[in-house]
Amino acid sequence: MECSNSCLTIDHVIQLDDDKEIRVWETLPKDNTAVRNNTILIASGFARRMDHFAGLAEYLSSNGFHVIRYDSLHHVGLSSGDINEFTMSIGKDSLLIVIEWLKGRGVNKLGLIAASLSARIAYEISNDVDLSFLVTAVGVVNLRDTLERSLKYDYLQLEIEDLPEDLDFEGHNLGSKVFVRDCFKHNWVTLDSTKNKMKNLDIPFIAFTANDDDWVKKAEVLEMMNSISSTKCKLYSLIGSSHDLGENLVVLRNFYQSVTKAAISLDNDSVDLNVEIFEPKFEELTSVTVQERRLKNKIESEILELMN
């Protein structure tokens, strides 16, 4: 565990077999804030590190939440492995490991916030673990369609031996063969597979779509929502946003505000966003972002030293 006096982010390491490790960051609730019932776990989107969600963690902790973030195995970030070996199942296993680790530390009331591709993983596990609530933003529900839209070609139609070695996804080389094999073997691909996992969801759930999202169809998110038997779920739209929630400061602030309101509402067993929030100052958001980048760089330097 590591935290300097000037940095409020606490660094943890989950040690696994084969010398692998998952890095976890913890942000404690700010002093003199409302007491919340649940801890928040944030699952970052594909090609996003946990420090990319520094602002959201600051918003949530400024409104009383204990916040946990992590980097998946075989992904960008501080955990072990290379992104060209990433699969949806590895993402799922990483999330489950962190949830189990939190339970071992006495964190039993947990709300999950997941974005983009990690939302598809959240949909997969939400009925299998003891969550208090779920929030997703620009969550993928039809993996095949999203991949085709983002990559400009339906690579999943090809035979495994005909796939290119790597796929350039958001500037990162995704190992195509290992990823596609896993998609079909473990049934990650279709909208129906997502609906089947979510239809019996019985925890409060809020989903956010973006009205300019070219990667996720709002109609398919709505179809998934309508397949859920519970009435404790609601769909909202992030107006003016694309799939990239950080494309500009206006979109980013709307994302922070909306998700923080959702977390507070769900913490009170409601799916209505008619709550007030405290907003951190821009200078505070900038400061914590810079501090976390420094912490990330320090950890990366230490990892490189150990490898040499």
UniProtKB/Swiss-Prot annotation:
Protein species of origin: Shewanella hanedai
Highest classification ranks of the organism: Bacteria, Pseudomonadati, Pseudomonadota, Gammaproteobacteria, Alteromonadales
* EC number(s) stated in the UniProt entry for this protein: 2.3.1.-
Q: Name one GO biological process term.
A: bioluminescence
**Superkingdom, taxonomy of origin:** Bacteria
Q: Tell me any Pfam family this protein matches.
A: Acyl_transf_2
- Protein name, as recorded: Acyl transferase
> Which family does the similarity line name?
Belongs to the LuxD family.
Q: Which gene encodes it?
A: luxD
Pathway membership: Lipid metabolism; fatty acid reduction for biolumincescence
Q: Which HAMAP family match?
A: LuxD
Q: EC top class, in one word?
A: transferase
Q: Where is the active site?
A: S116 (charge relay system), D213 (charge relay system), H243 (charge relay system)
